[in-house]
Curated annotation (Swiss-Prot):
The C-terminal part (659-707) contributes to MTREX RNA helicase activity, in part, by enhancing its RNA-dependent ATPase activity. Residues 468-499 have a biased composition (Pro residues). Residues 1-47, 409-518, 533-667 are annotated as: Disordered. Its main location: nucleus. This is Zinc finger CCHC domain-containing protein 8. It comes from Mus musculus (Mouse). PANTHER family: ZINC FINGER CCHC DOMAIN-CONTAINING PROTEIN 8 (PTHR13316:SF0), ZINC FINGER, CCHC DOMAIN CONTAINING 8 (PTHR13316).
Length: 709
C-alpha cells in the first residue's frame, strides 16, 4: 500500500541544481484489482481507510522534517557560496585570498583583529615584492584534484565573464587548526608539479619501535650486522675522505682501519667481501634453462599448450636466427700475426691494410627451434596466418644455415690466394709490379737455378715458392708501396754530357721495342759499356774520375764508397719502361775502342757472353749480379736484328756461395736519413774535401777485401 505515497521533496535539491523549468509533480493513479475490490467490500467497518490515513500522517511528518533539513543546508551552503556579480580580471590576484571561519575559541576571539591585520599585511608585502622582483612572485600552482569550487547564488543569473573565472573561487585548502595539531582536508597544491619545491610536504619521521623482523615463537632473532659507514681511515672522521684528511698520514693506522672496514663489510653482507664468481656456479644456477626448450611454467605464462607453437616462433620466421645465440656459437680468432722469420704468404698484408679477424662458428651450438629451423612435430598445427607471419622458409633450416655459415667464411689461405689471384688478373696494377720487381731483383733468387721451369701463371709457382734467407751483403727490402729509386751509374771518361734528345725521357719508343730487335754484337757492346761503368764505380773513387764537363745531377754521388748503391731491387716493370743505363747510346766504336772484335757467329757470341757473366758473378757482389741479370738480359728492347734473347736459365749453373748469417757491418747504416744543415753555405763542398779521407774508412777497406777475394 506504500507504493502510492511519494517520499522526498524537490526543494531539497534546489540549492544544487539550477531551476531550469518548473517540474510537474508526479500523479499516481492507483487501479484496484478484483481482489482489492472484494477486500474493500469486506471492510465494512472502515479499517482500510484508517490505515491509509495513518500512512498519510507519517508521510507528512517526514516531509516537514526534510524541509527543515533543507533549510539548514541552504543556510550552511551560503557560507561556501561565492557572491554573485563580481567580475574577476586576473584569477591569480583579483580572486578571494582566503576565507576564514572563526570558531568559538578564546584564542580566535582574542586575536581576531590581529589575524585580519596579518592578512592585509601579506597583501601589501606581495605588492611590494611584485614591484621589485616579478619573477619571485610568479608561481604556477594549479588546483589539486581534491579542490572544491564555490558555487554562485543560483537566484541571480550568471554572466559569461563570471563563468569563465570560476578558477578564482576554487578552494585549494581547508585546514582545521587545533592547539596541538591541525587537520588538513584537501591538501596543498604542488609548485610546478614538483613536491620537492612545495613547502609543507616534508615526510614526517615517526619513532621506530622494531628495528628487526620479529621472529616466530621458538625461533631466535638473527641480528644482521650493520654495514659500516665510509669514513677516513687516517683520523676516523665521517665528514671527509682519506685523501682530504688534514692530519698527517699514519700508514699503520690506515692499514688497520682499512682491514677492519673490509672485514665489517664482509660480515654485513654475509659473505666474503671479495667474492669470486665461477662459470660452473652460473651453469648450475641456470642449467634448467635451455634455448629452444619451453618449460611448463613458460607455457603457462604464454598461455600455450604442448599442441601449439609459441607465438615468438612465428616472429622468428620474419626476423631470422637470434643474433645472441649466433654470437654464442662464434669462434673468433684474435687476429694477431706471429712472425718466425719465414715470409709466409698467408700473413702477407699490404701497407696500411688491417688484417681481418677470422671468424668461424661451432655448428654444434646452433639451437633447434621446432617450427623455425627444424620441422614441426607431428600433431602441432602451423597457425602462421592467424599470427600474420610467414610459413617456414627453406633457407632457415638448420642444415642449410650451417652450410651457409661454412661457405661464407674464408680461411686465411683462401683469402690470401684470392688476393694473389686478383693481383694476377690485372697485369697493369702497381701492386703486381712491385711484387714482381721485388721477386726479380732479389739477389737470392738470382743465384738459384732450377732445372724444371714452372709456368709463371700457375698457382703452385706462387703459393709454393722457396724463399731462402738473404745473404749478408743484401740490404733489407724496402717496405711495400715505396717507389723504386732510379740509379745512374758513373759515366766513363770521355763521355759527352746528356742532351735533351738523348735523354731517356726523349726516347719513349725504346721501351716499346721488340725483344728480338738487338743483335749479338749490340748486346756485347752494351755489356762492355756496363762493365766499364762498374769498373769505374769500383776502382775510381777520386775527384779525377768524373770529368769537369760532366754535369752533377741528383744521382751523381753514386761513385761514393757506399756499398748499397747497386744492392737495391729494381722492379721488372720499371726495367721494361726505361733502360737501365742512363748514358747516351753511342756507337760501339766510339765508346770502347780497346774491346775485342765482336764475333760474327751467334754461337761464339753466346759463349763470350756466358763467360763474361761467370766472371761478373765471381768478381762482383750480389749487386753486380743484379745489374748483370737485370740490366744485360733486359737489354733486348733496343733496335737491331731478329736475334733471339738469351733466357736467364740457359746459362751454366753457378756454384752456391757460402755467407755468414750475420749481416755486414755496413748494412746497419742503411736507411739513415742525413741531417740537413740550416747553413748550407758552410756545408757545401765539405764532402768533396774529406772524400779522400773516406777512402781509408773501414767500409771501403771491407769492400776492397771482398773485391780482392
Amino acid at each position: 500500500m506504500a507504493a502510492g505515497v511519494d517520499f522526498g521533496d524537490l526543494e531539497l535539491f534546489e540549492a544544487f541544481d539550477p531551476p531550469e523549468e518548473s517540474t510537474p509533480k508526479p500523479v499516481h493513479t492507483r487501479f484496484k484489482d478484483d481482489e482489492e475490490e472484494e477486500d474493500d467490500d469486506d471492510d465494512e467497518n472502515g479499517v482500510g481507510d484508517a490505515e491509509l490515513q495513518e500512512q498519510l500522517r507519517r508521510c507528512e511528518a517526514t516531509i516537514e522534517q526534510l524541509r527543515a533539513e533543507n533549510q539548514e543546508l541552504k543556510r550552511k551552503l551560503n557560507i561556501l557560496t561565492r557572491p554573485s556579480g563580481i567580475l574577476v580580471s586576473n584569477t591569480k590576484i583579483d580572486g578571494p585570498l582566503l576565507q576564514i571561519l572563526f570558531m568559538n575559541n578564546a584564542i580566535s576571539k582574542q586575536y581576531h583583529q590581529e589575524i585580519e591585520e596579518f592578512v592585509s599585511n601579506l597583501v601589501k608585502r606581495f605588492e611590494e615584492q611584485q614591484k621589485n622582483d616579478v619573477e619571485k612572485t610568479s608561481f604556477s600552482l594549479l588546483p589539486q584534484p581534491s579542490s572544491v569550487m564555490l558555487e554562485e547564488d543560483h537566484k541571480v543569473e550568471e554572466s559569461c565573464a563570471v563563468k569563465n573565472n570560476k578558477e578564482a573561487f576554487s578552494v585549494v585548502g581547508s585546514v582545521l587548526y587545533f592547539t596541538n595539531f591541525c587537520l588538513d582536508k584537501l591538501g596543498q597544491p604542488l609548485l610546478n608539479e614538483n613536491p620537492q619545491l612545495t613547502e609543507g610536504w616534508e615526510i614526517p619521521k615517526y619513532q621506530q619501535v622494531f628495528s628487526h623482523i620479529v621472529p616466530l615463537e621458538g625461533q631466535e632473532m638473527q641480528v644482521k650486522a650493520k654495514r659500516p659507514k665510509p669514513h677516513c681511515f687516517n683520523c676516523g672522521s665521517e665528514e671527509h675522505q682519506m685523501k682530504e684528511c688534514p692530519m698527517p698520514r699514519n700508514a699503520a693506522r690506515i692499514s688497520e682501519k682499512r682491514k677492519e672496514y673490509m672485514d665489517a663489510c664482509g660480515e654485513a653482507s654475509g659473505q666474503s667481501f671479495q667474492q669470486r664468481y665461477h662459470a660452473e656456479e652460473v651453469e648450475e644456477r641456470f642449467g634448467r634453462f635451455k634455448p629452444g626448450v619451453i618449460s611448463e611454467e613458460l607455457q603457462d605464462a604464454l598461455g600455450v599448450t604442448d599442441k601449439s607453437l609459441p607465438p615468438f616462433i612465428y616472429r622468428m620466421r620474419q626476423l631470422g636466427y637470434p643474433p645472441g645465440w649466433l654470437k654464442e656459437a662464434e669462434l673468433e680468432n684474435s687476429g694477431l700475426a706471429l712472425y718466425d722469420g719465414n715470409d709466409d704468404a698467408d700473413g702477407e698484408t699490404e701497407t696500411g691494410e688491417i688484417q681481418n679477424k677470422n671468424v668461424t662458428y661451432d655448428l654444434s651450438k646452433l639451437v633447434n627451434y621446432p617450427g623455425f629451423n627444424i620441422s614441426t612435430p607431428r600433431g602441432i598445427p602451423d597457425e602462421w596466418r592467424m599470427f600474420g607471419s610467414i610459413p617456414m622458409q627453406a633457407c632457415q633450416q638448420k642444415d642449410v644455415f650451417a652450410s651457409y655459415l661454412n661457405s661464407n667464411i674464408q680461411s686465411p689461405s683462401m683469402r690470401s690466394s684470392g688476393k694473389r689471384s686478383s693481383s694476377q688478373s690485372s697485369p697493369n696494377s702497381p701492386k703486381k709490379q712491385r711484387k714482381e720487381g721485388s721477386a726479380a731483383a732479389s739477389p737470392a733468387d738470382m743465384e738459384l737455378d732450377s732445372d724444371v721451369e714452372i709456368p709463371p701463371g700457375s698457382q703452385s709457382s706462387k703459393a709454393f715458392q722457396f724463399q731462402p734467407p738473404l745473404p749478408p751483403g743484401t740490404p733489407p727490402p724496402l717496405p711495400q708501396g715505396t717507389p723504386p729509386p732510379l740509379f745512374t751509374p758513373p759515366l766513363p771518361k770521355g763521355t759527352p754530357p746528356l742532351t735533351p734528345s738523348d735523354s731517356p725521357q726523349a726516347r719513349p719508343a725504346a721501351s716499346a721495342m721488340d725483344e728480338d730487335a738487338l743483335t749479338l754484337e749490340e748486346l756485347e757492346e752494351q755489356q762492355r759499356q756496363i762493365w766499364a761503368a762498374l769498373q769505374q764505380a769500383e776502382g775510381g773513387n777520386g775527384d779525377s774520375d768524373v770529368p769537369g764537363d760532366t754535369p752533377l745531377t741528383g744521382n751523381s754521388v753514386a761513385s761514393s764508397p757506399c756499398p748499397n748503391e747497386f744492392d737495391l731491387p729494381v722492379p721488372e716493370g720499371k726495367a721494361l719502361e726505361k733502360p737501365v743505363l742512363a748514358e747516351p747510346q753511342e756507337p760501339a766504336a766510339s765508346v770502347d775502342t780497346a774491346g775485342p772484335e765482336p764475333s760474327c757467329s751467334p754461337a761464339a757470341g753466346a759463349a763470350v757472353l756466358s763467360q763474361r757473366e761467370e766472371e761478373a758473378a765471381a768478381e762482383g757482389g750480389p749487386g753486380d749480379a743484379l745489374l748483370d741479370n737485370g740490366g744485360v738480359l733486359n737489354m733486348n728492347m733496343s733496335n737491331g736484328s731478329n736475334q733471339q734473347p738469351i733466357h736467364p736459365d740457359s746459362r751454366p749453373p753457378m756454384a752456391p756461395k757460402t755467407h755468414s748469417p750475420v749481416p755486414d757491418m755496413s748494412k746497419f747504416a742503411t736507411g739513415i736519413t742525413p741531417f740537413e744543415f740550416e747553413n748550407m753555405a758552410e756545408s757545401t763542398g765539405m764532402y768533396l774535401r774529406i772524400r779522400n779521407l773516406l777512402k781509408n774508412s773501414p767500409r771501403n777497406q771491407q769492400k776492397n777485401k771482398k773485391t780482392c777475394e
